[in-house]
A protein has these predicted regions:
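Polar, enzyme-active/binding microenvironments
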Residues: 1-209
Length: 209
């Protein structure tokens, strides 16, 4: 195989195969190109926690549609995505906390499936995604936690503890670049403005950037 760069957009190069063999090298697009999804949540004043999977188009402005159900109604979960599936990890309903990891396919409208567990029950962690793994950082387990959990997209399996963010907290926002995950803000008895960064290339603690 031989590849030529056909799009030199910064951080989004596309390399096209011009030799023998098949397959081109396209950029990893975190947010997807066709649809957005919303999983679960807390609907007030009733019925409370829900298990609905909503899907909405990026192509046209329109309402979301209900395309499936999670295995467990919950709110305060983290979200991750691979190129083929969306993931929901953790969450709670009332005083019950969850450590489950659910997977939802993008190719068909269907229910989620339970494919593994995080290392601990977690409410309100933040979610990050590389091209190969999903991450949850921080959260609340009965006390604030600083654990970074990592699970693979290649097989259905439990997460492993691969490091710590700099400060245990819940309610942070998660962001992802092609090389790093970020945990920003949060609450640990008071609101904080810390931005933590951890690398996808190695299992290590986050740093305050």
């Amino acid at each position: 195989e031989m590849f030529a760069c056909t799009d030199a957009t910064t951080d989004e190069n596309v390399w096209t195969n011009v030799g023998a063999g098949t397959g081109d090298v396209a950029p990893y697009t975190f947010q997807g190109t066709s649809y957005g999804y919303a999983y679960g949540g807390d609907q007030q004043p009733s019925p409370g926690a829900i298990n609905v999977i909503d899907k909405y188009s990026y192509v046209s402005d329109a309402d979301a549609t209900d395309v499936g159900d999670l295995t467990q109604a919950s709110y305060g979960a983290a979200g991750q995505k691979s190129s083929t599936h969306g993931y929901v990890s953790g969450g709670r309903i009332g005083g019950t906390y969850y450590n489950t990891i659910e997977k939802i396919p993008f190719s068909t409208d269907s229910d989620g499936t339970d494919i593994g567990d995080m290392t601990a029950i977690k409410y309100s962690p933040s979610g990050q995604s590389s091209s190969t793994h999903g991450y949850t950082s921080g959260g609340y387990t009965g006390s604030y936690t600083n654990i970074i959990d990592k699970f693979t997209f290649a097989v259905d399996a439990d997460a492993t503890d691969v490091g710590d963010i700099t400060l245990a907290r819940q309610g942070s926002t998660g962001q992802s670049s092609s090389t790093h995950g970020y945990t920003s803000g949060g609450y640990t008895g008071s609101f904080i403005d810390i931005i933590d960064r951890f690398t996808f290339s190695a299992d290590a603690d986050a740093t305050d950037v």
